[in-house]
Amino acid sequence: TGADFDREKGSVTIIFQIVGATTAVLNTLEEGDSVCDFVGPLGVPSHTEGLKRVCVVGGGVGCAIAYPVAKKLAASGCEVHTIVGFRSRDLLILEDEFKAVSDRYFVMTDDGSYGEKGLVTDALRKLLESGEKYDEVIAIGPLVMMKFVCALTKEFGVKTMISMNPIMIDGTGMCGCCRLTVGGEMKFACVDGPDFDGHQVDFNEAMDRLTMYRPQEAERREAHCNLFKGV
């Protein structure tokens, strides 16, 4: 996941979590090693113009995408409230970076090992119920997290944008792997997205599509390294 860049150094920062064979191989690379291809960014740039007060909600590795969005918002003079969620403290990323661009910063962990115990929706609900008003909520993370963030913000009538990260192959819309239903219409995350109005996305369909290759992923993961057994 692309998290940052340095135009002067000509570098891009990516953050990944080992979840399968591909990320396991990526984790073996050392300084000076290379990968065959690196493609991006894809789709349409995130819209941040004109926003004065935004709540950015990030979950897990999705925080790597949420950070540059929060950074861009802060640079434009927007007031940024950030909520990040992780399973445990061990998986926490980009804390100093988020604090540097956030007017308010909240950490939630499933096990309570850091920040407050609970879900990002718990923190967001408290803010909304306390009377906080936002031009927009931007949620980036696991599909189930974004689904429930959108369900919550819909209760309060707050516009919510999400960043979709479905399976992609060619990145041009030709393969159709990243297609989604948004507002009853077919969209492609790689060319029309990745940002969409969360209240218009068919999350159930998106979650079903995400599991299409799970058997093949499990097989490849097992073949790569038996250290993954039981994980």
Protein language model regions, located:
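Residues in well-ordered beta-strands of folded domains
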Residues: 3, 15, 36-38, 191
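Local cysteine-cluster metal-coordination motifs and their immediate loop/turn environment
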Residues: 65, 143-144, 165-195, 223-229
